[in-house]
Regions:
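S-adenosyl-L-methionine-dependent methyltransferase catalytic core, i.e., the SAM/SAH-binding region
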Residues: 1-190
Length: 190
């Protein structure tokens, strides 16, 4: 809708996921003369605008979090519903993966991100369960992580409507992709 309504304006789309950019390019093809898509993190907005020779913008719209297509691709490791390697990177060129977060970050840091980024009330128990499991062998897949999370939760929590791993997966994904840091950086520039 935005691209269709621009008359003299230009829409700059920034995404760190190359597949999302390809999909956006197809979707926005009718307005290609008004749209520029850039493979970057939106936290690099100032650099992107400098490279395009743009000195200011009239508005900014941030589409945060994970998309349905990313969840649908099990091999990306975002979903707690399908078995896949622990990845969760929005941009596969980034180095930090969910595997590294889950298997190498200190227990207290895991507890912190589970609580702060996922609002997980069982964060201490889940972090402790992860710490115990990875002491035996690394947690390598999404469903292995789901099993560890389930093992740390009381039976009543497992009966709740929401999937028991939802908040933890959200927290780990946010940490892997530095999503809150990216928002903070783009707001500083905006």
């Amino acid at each position: 809708q935005i691209a269709a309504r621009l008359t003299p304006g230009r829409l700059i789309g920034i995404d760190r996921d190359p597949k999302a950019l390809r999909a956006a390019s197809r979707r926005l093809a009718p307005w290609a003369d008004r749209v520029t898509l850039v493979h970057s993190n939106f936290s690099q907005l100032d650099e992107v605008l400098d490279n395009l020779g743009i000195e200011g913008v009239d508005g900014i719209l941030l589409d945060l979090g994970v998309s349905s297509p990313q969840l649908d691709e099990a091999e990306r490791g975002f979903s707690y519903m399908a078995d896949a390697p622990l990845d969760m990177r929005m941009n596969s060129e980034d180095s930090l993966t969910a595997y590294e977060v889950v298997n190498t970050w200190p227990r207290e840091e895991l507890r912190r991100i589970l609580y702060e980024y996922g609002e997980e009330r069982y964060a201490p128990q889940i972090a402790a369960a992860i710490d115990r499991r990875r002491a035996d062998k690394p947690i390598a897949t999404t469903l292995e992580l789901v099993d560890v999370i389930r093992s740390a939760m009381p039976p009543a929590a497992l009966r709740e409507k929401q999937h028991p791993a939802k908040r933890s997966f959200q927290a780990i994904r946010i940490a892997v992709n530095d999503e809150l840091g990216a928002v903070g950086r783009v707001l500083e520039v905006a």
